[in-house]
Structures are given as structure tokens and as C-alpha cells.
A protein has these predicted regions:
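Active-site catalytic-loop/activation-segment of kinase and kinase-like phosphoryl-transfer enzymes
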Residues: 1-11, 147-191, 283
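Juxta-kinase regulatory segment immediately upstream of eukaryotic protein kinase catalytic domains
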Residues: 1-33
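Structural element of the ATP-grasp superfamily
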Residues: 19, 83-87, 112, 257, ...
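Short secondary-structure junctions
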Residues: 22-30, 91-96, 261-264
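Active-site acidic catalytic loop and adjacent metal/ATP-binding pocket
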Residues: 35-57, 188-231
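ATP-binding pocket architecture of kinase catalytic cores
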Residues: 46-152
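Active-site Asp-x-Gly
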Residues: 67-72, 76, 199, 212-252
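Active-site activation/catalytic loop segments of kinase-like enzymes and analogous catalytic loops
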Residues: 82, 230-262, 274-293
Length: 310
């Protein structure tokens, strides 16, 4: 197995050679362009073009893309590939996600179906608030995902990524919080670290939703894990609140999830995970991708603390 080469958008010839070597480009094909496919926080994400077609190329490099000083395990690429394969094997879920076209374990590459350009953050959050049909589809996706009967061995070992995520969700953002709030976050973090429960997307927010003529699609499951379903629901609820939903969004979402065929969930736990997501997006390294004035930010901080203590 050859040592990986860490790519950039400027490496058109190198990328073309690698795609040809993998059989992802025909011998008589060539790349016509390579461009960034968005502001990925974790992975390098490129859009690669050949005559008449395009695809998304993702590489897991040994650091966090947005914060290169933060190390991240490259094995996350294999975990993400497994998630796509598991979902594509489920008839009720496969239409929700882009097709995985190829996996290169040596260079930690995934080649994905190109769903087209994604809207900017403001448009995504507005649509999350106003597109009732898409919201229904997203809830149905979570209900179906969490219903999959899978052994823990269905995913490659993900412990290093789980611990990195745990630190940036439940620990580091609470360094300046009061001791009671930090202690509650720590207890919730232990639930996350257990690795027990159904398969979760792990980062179910508007940046992972792509809207098209045939409905909404779900992307970027690189934070996937086995865990409590309330975590996915709490993350979604937090971002629905940011998009304009009322503070009761966690309760409303839990009820809609069960109406969609999801299993029994703990409403209080959804609220707490929603509070955690709000707090870590306000104080952690992955801030909300929308502009907040001081009044709105202060209101969200107070709401987050209240939800965590619920």
C-alpha cells in the first residue's frame, strides 16, 4: 500500500493520475478542473470535473481542515465509507444520501456523487425553518437510520474520533462555564462515549442537508457513531431553534420523530443535548455559520444553559 499524498485543489494532474490508477477515470479521460466544494470543517472536499460529469472527492488528512493544528485520525474516512454503505443497503434510506462511487483506503479518499452546489448558510437555515416537507423527510431519515439493526462491528473502530469529538462538544466549550453546568455536560458526555445504541449521523445540522428537485439529501456522516438517538435529535433541534423555531423545538421534534415511526425517546435528554449543541457552537471551535447580534447570542446562551439543566 502506497503512502498517502495529502492533496490540495491545485493538484489537478496528481488527482487525475490517482483517479485513473483507481479506475475512477477511463484511460481516455482527463480532469478538466478541480475546485473547492465548500468550507469543510473536518475534511478536504473537492469537486472534480471531467467532460460531461463531475464528482465530489473527499480526503481525510491527519488534521482538522479548518484548524490544522488539531490532529484528527485519518481512519475516519473508512468509518464514513461504512456509513454510506450501510445506508445504501437499506431500501428506505438509500435515496436520502449521495452514492458512494469509490473508496481509496491508501490515500483516505472517498469519491461521491455530486449533488450540485449547496446554498449559503443563511439560506440553509432559512429553509430549515420554512420547508415543512423537507423537515418531514429529515425526521423520517433519522427514524429509519436509528431503526437499523446493526452490530457494533458494522463500523470500523472509531474510538479516536469519538474521543476527539467528545472533547470539542462536552469538555472544551465548558472550560469557562460554572461548575454545575460543566458537570452536567460531563455526565452527558459519558452517554456519548459509551458507544451504545443505534447508528447515529452525529452532526445532523443544516450544513449536512442538501436541497434538490427530488427532495432533501443528507451528507457528511464523518462524525457517525453508535449512541443515544436523542443526540441526533438534540443537534437537529438546536439548529432549528437557531433558524427560528421556538425553544420547545426539542419536544416538538421528539413527538414528530415518534410519529414518523421512531422509537421511544427521552424528551428531557433531547433538550439537554440540544443545549449542549447550542453551547458548543457558541463557545467551541465550530461556531454557528450564521451571524448573530449580541442580543440574539445572549438569548441563545441563556437558553442553552436552561436546556442543559432541564
Amino acid at each position: 500500500m502506497t503512502a498517502p499524498i495529502w492533496l490540495t485543489a491545485a493538484d489537478t494532474a496528481l488527482i487525475g493520475d490517482r483517479l485513473c490508477a483507481l479506475g475512477w477515470l477511463a484511460p481516455d479521460e482527463a480532469l478538466t478542473d478541480v475546485a473547492s466544494a465548500g468550507d469543510g470543517n473536518l475534511n478536504l472536499v473537492l469537486r472534480v470535473f471531467a467532460i460531461g460529469r463531475s464528482a465530489i472527492l473527499k480526503q481525510a488528512r491527519p488534521w482538522v481542515e479548518k484548524y490544522p493544528t488539531i490532529a484528527a485520525p485519518v481512519e475516519r474516512s473508512a468509518v464514513e465509507a461504512s456509513f454510506y454503505q450501510l445506508v445504501r443497503a437499506a431500501p428506505a434510506l438509500r435515496t436520502f444520501m449521495p452514492q458512494l462511487l469509490g473508496v481509496d483506503p491508501a490515500w483516505h479518499l472517498l469519491l461521491m456523487e455530486d449533488l450540485g452546489e449547496q446554498a449559503d448558510a443563511a439560506a440553509l437555515y432559512h429553509r430549515a425553518s420554512t420547508d415543512a416537507a423537507a423537515r418531514t423527510q429529515l425526521i423520517a431519515f433519522l427514524a429509519g437510520l436509528h431503526a437499523l439493526d446493526l452490530p457494533l462491528a458494522a463500523l470500523p473502530d472509531n474510538r479516536a474520533m469519538l474521543e476527539l469529538n467528545h472533547a470539542h462538544i462536552f469538555t472544551l466549550p465548558f472550560a469557562g462555564a460554572d461548575s454545575d453546568l460543566a458537570a452536567t455536560a460531563a455526565r452527558l458526555g459519558q452517554r456519548y462515549l459509551l458507544g451504545a445504541g443505534p447508528l447515529l449521523h452525529g452532526d445532523f445540522f443544516p450544513g449536512a442537508w442538501v436541497y434538490g428537485d427530488d427532495g432533501v439529501k443528507v451528507i457528511d456522516p464523518e462524525f457517525c457513531l453508535f449512541g443515544p438517538p436523542e443526540f441526533d435529535l438534540g443537534v437537529m433541534a438546536a439548529h432549528l431553534i437557531v433558524s427560528g423555531d421556538p425553544p420547545e423545538a426539542p419536544d416538538h421534534l421528539g413527538a414528530a420523530y415518534q410519529s414518523a415511526g421512531g422509537g421511544a425517546v427521552d424528551s428531557a435528554l433531547i433538550r439537554r443535548f440540544a443545549g449542549i449543541e447550542l453551547w458548543r457552537r457558541l463557545f467551541g471551535v465550530a461556531p454557528l455559520p450564521v451571524v448573530l447580534d449580541h442580543r440574539r447570542k445572549d438569548a441563545l446562551i441563556a437558553l442553552a444553559a436552561g436546556l442543559i439543566r432541564a
